[in-house]
Amino acid sequence: MQHSIGKTLLVAALATAIAGPVQAEKKSLHIYNWTDYIAPTTLKDFTKESGIDVSYDVFDSNETLEGKLVSGHSGYDIVVPSNNFLGKQIQAGAFQKLDKSKLPNWKNLDPALLKQLEVSDPGNQYAVPYLWGTNGIGYNVAKVKEVLGDQPIDSWAILFEPENMKKLAKCGVAFMDSGDEMLPAALNYLGLDPNTHDPKDYKKAEEVLTKVRPYVSYFHSSKYISDLANGNICVAFGYSGDVFQAAARAEEAGKGIDIQYVIPKEGANLWFDLMAIPADAKAADNAYAFIDYLLRPEVIAKVSDYVGYANAIPGARPLMDKSVSDSEEVYPPQAVLDKLYVSAVLPAKVLRLQTRTWTRIKTGK
């Protein structure tokens, strides 16, 4: 996944106790998470309860996170990779194996979801589910109707066919700046395997995206949240919860902007974001304390309410705001889930092909 890049937030610093001439050592924790992906009070509430100061940085693509991890000196105690990147990072030795004796609230997690995640993390040995969601189309109802008329917004054709994009360009279109999100969607739209290894398939997806490239206002994986909410763009390829946040911001602003989200009828990506402890973490015990804190139903319920993403704890759903817990955009019905695909761990050769293809699409070279 997702999910605005900001400066490091030093949250809820507490005065350290002085014992005679010796100052007690501060307990600290360094977290690297997706943009707009936690409730406003979560960190300060944790600090108040635990006495652990939290330093919090954000990113908006798995590629950015991977760059930190590959260096071997991430500087973080908790990071939040998506499921399709997790397997590769585990194989590279990027994470510590979990000590589940330090996670008493592990019992609160959904066993069925844990089983799904074993594709990337056999035995659930390295990562803890945080939130999950889908990719789809976020759009400004009035502006899109203005340029497309009564055409239903229910297909990837809205974004992947030039005749539609040419019209939408008048009010602004945002695509994610992430080949591992955009290319599988185009492959799936073409009826091809979104996890294909075949270069010929990627060539077909490249052709689709290259044809609509002239009509894309920009490529960014989080800017579209505020731009949808403000009416600066009318449509975006986006994460479900990010569009939910845009809709909430638009409603709060009271300017009559109605933002909706749709999972196209052809299907879309179902993804999971997970908490993991980097191999070079210096405060692993504090990381366990925070992860276990987030495994409390009442804590993760507030996070889901704020960010608009589903969580992995069944006991949290009754505690959530009905507008979130009952939303089919957040918790899709089974008929929709059946059409979704989960991104697989791809070999390095295919990932390089994805990267080269995406660079050509973006630059037109």
Curated annotation (Swiss-Prot):
Keywords, sorted A to Z: Periplasm, Signal, Transport, Virulence
Effect of W271F: Increases affinity for putrescine (to KD=1.12 uM)
UniProt cross-references to CDD domains, sorted A to Z: PBP2_PotF
GO cellular component, one term: periplasmic space
A GO molecular-function descriptor: spermidine binding
Signal peptide: 1-24
Domain of life of the native organism: Bacteria
Protein's cellular compartments: Periplasm
Annotated spermidine binding sites: T35, E181, D242, N269
Phenotypic consequence of gene deletion: Significant decrease in T3SS induction.
GO biological process, one term: polyamine transport
Chief localization: periplasm
InterPro entries in the record: SBP, Sperm_putr-bd
UniProt keyword Transcription regulation, yes or no: no
Similarity comment: family membership: Belongs to the bacterial solute-binding protein PotD/PotF family.
Role: Spermidine-binding protein probably required for its uptake into cells. Binds spermidine with high affinity (KD=14.3 nM). Does not bind putrescine, cadaverine or spermine. Spermidine binding induces large inter-domain conformational changes. Implicated in induction of type 3 secretion systems (T3SS), which play a role in virulence.
Name of this chain's protein: Spermidine-binding periplasmic protein SpuE
Organism expressing this protein natively: Pseudomonas aeruginosa (strain ATCC 15692 / DSM 22644 / CIP 104116 / JCM 14847 / LMG 12228 / 1C / PRS 101 / PAO1)
